[in-house]
């Protein structure tokens, strides 16, 4: 499952070409004629914001000779995408609007068969989702209960502060596996043990999606971890979340609740809306996996 090309082909045929995929963020397409590109398998995908402010997804290839249309990861067109091969021009809605020597095309350059191939595309909660499957089920139905869970965070009202790409020389599932359990914490992240409970973890399954809830701000219950003394990493976590460890009179078991109260208390001052979140969500990691490969550490 991790090294077989035959199994990879099965994944392509039954997963990647059938489901909803995350294409980017709504804030990447703030204005009409903005665009981004993304890749899945051997395909390049073009996602645009039309003059009507609708987001659309297309195969990023000119319909004439299959040349890559948009060469950059993101940008803004004046009015059209211009193919660098024969100068065919498409607007942000995927319509072919001009081609040299139009009289040589008996069907006319405005024929629908010459427009870019459009893919299902929807915006949701600050995300832009697309699918290679023209018959994909509605996004709301595909997300199931995870949709309402994640909408509570109002991602669409947040601003991106860092965007980083790290390439791993491994099968994609090796990465996803690592973000679907806390069994590895002791071996890989022992420095986290004084402020993260790696054992009392709630796991919820929602059809093809899942989440697990990891208590933060409390020591691991493993026998070698002090349950009373506030360790150095717990001190840092407390400071990050509005609790001064120098003034705190409680022990390590009481820090998590103090963090939750501090977050509520300073929410208005910081401009945070926690009205849809419970207290545990203010301290813990509500970790979601949107099938098959999107993981979210919401804390």
Give residue ranges: language-model regions.
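Tryptophan-centered motif/residue detector
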Residues: 16, 20, 88, 124-127, ...
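C-terminal catalytic domain of Rieske-type non-heme iron oxygenases
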Residues: 49, 54, 120-122, 127-299
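Short Pro/Gly-enriched beta-strand edge/turn motifs at strand-loop
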Residues: 17-29, 99-105, 288-292
